[in-house]
Amino acid sequence: MGKIVGAFAASHSPGVTGWPERAEPRKREAIEGAFAEARRRIDALEPDAIIAISVEHFTNFNFGNLPAFAIATADSYLGPVTPEMSNFLRVEQHQYPGNGKLGRHIYEFAISNEFDPSLVEGGLDFDENFCVPFKHLDPESKYPLVPIIVNGVNPPWPTAKRSYEFGEMLRRAVEAQDAVERVVVVGTGGLSHWVGLPEAGQVNEEFDRDFITRIESGDPEQLKSYSPKEIDAAGNGAHEVRTWIAAAGAIGAPFEVLAYEPVPEWLTGTAVAAATPDLKL
């Protein structure tokens, strides 16, 4: 039987890799140190695959086709999507390995368990959503990925409750197969930030710290109770926290936030977190 052996979550601001030097040295060191610790823990868990949950910045989807959830089933993924984005993010363009069989299993399991995600069979190109965090978490791209997209960019969004339950479904899907034994989940996005708006560069530290308290509590209801209006107060980009909420549902355990820093130079409240099943309360 497969098992989710760990879950991680991290911000994916382009500034983390594209212009890290603009942040205050103390804040940069804290975030990069947290990424290094998360990478160490992932390697120690020896995963056979990583379920990577993020949002999609219109690299593949658009306003005319914007699913609440989407599951990709390719055996490789291009990222960053263009040479220009590669230069912007300071991430070398390359192919990330995928586990298409596990992705297909999760999709079919979801359909049989009251979820109706979109199926992406033809590949899914990456932008900062996966390229930024995985430059730190898996710089050699040695772990096969199952990319999953949660709509966190434009309403109507899936509810926080539905996002958490989607994560719980992922756990059951992994446990319902035995081809891949050890699976890690990584959610990326958030925390507070505004994209393409006059408020860009602001950070809602109050929201961020409240979110951290909730995700460290291990109490599902504290995460599932978020309303879109509450999240709106932290910026249109804050809706990406649904990826963290889904990761929390997948692991069913409290997270340890390894670092949090409000970094206006990166346009984001930036955090890295980790959880393992043995941390259950």
Model-predicted segments: where are they?
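Beta-strand elements within well-structured catalytic alpha/beta cores of enzymes
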Residues: 48-54, 148, 181-189
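Short catalytic/ligand-binding loop motif for oxyanion handling, primarily in non-cytosolic enzymes
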Residues: 58-62, 192-196
